Amino acid sequence: ELDEGNGLRRPVCGEMAELLACPLVNLPVCGTDGNTYANECLLCVQKMKTRQDIRILNNGRCRDT
């Protein structure tokens, strides 16, 4: 789901993230926290653990700054 205005995408967090049972799929995404996650589900798990509003900055690995 794309946010209007800032271009950041909200991760789609389903049951698997709630159960902490993410698939072993390597489709990296870059979170707004600056971390690269192996897939969207793992970003969701981190989002739930930290209770932060982590969104998807871009598909693929985060760029080194």
From Swiss-Prot:
Superkingdom per UniProt: Eukaryota
Record-annotated site: Reactive bond: 24-25
Any Pfam family the entry gives: Kazal_1
Disulphide-bridged cysteine pairs: 13-44, 22-41, 30-62
The entry's keywords: Disulfide bond, Protease inhibitor, Secreted, Serine protease inhibitor
Protein name: Chymotrypsin inhibitor
Subunit organization: Monomer.
InterPro entries: Kazal_dom, Kazal_dom_sf
Record domain Kazal-like: where: 7-64
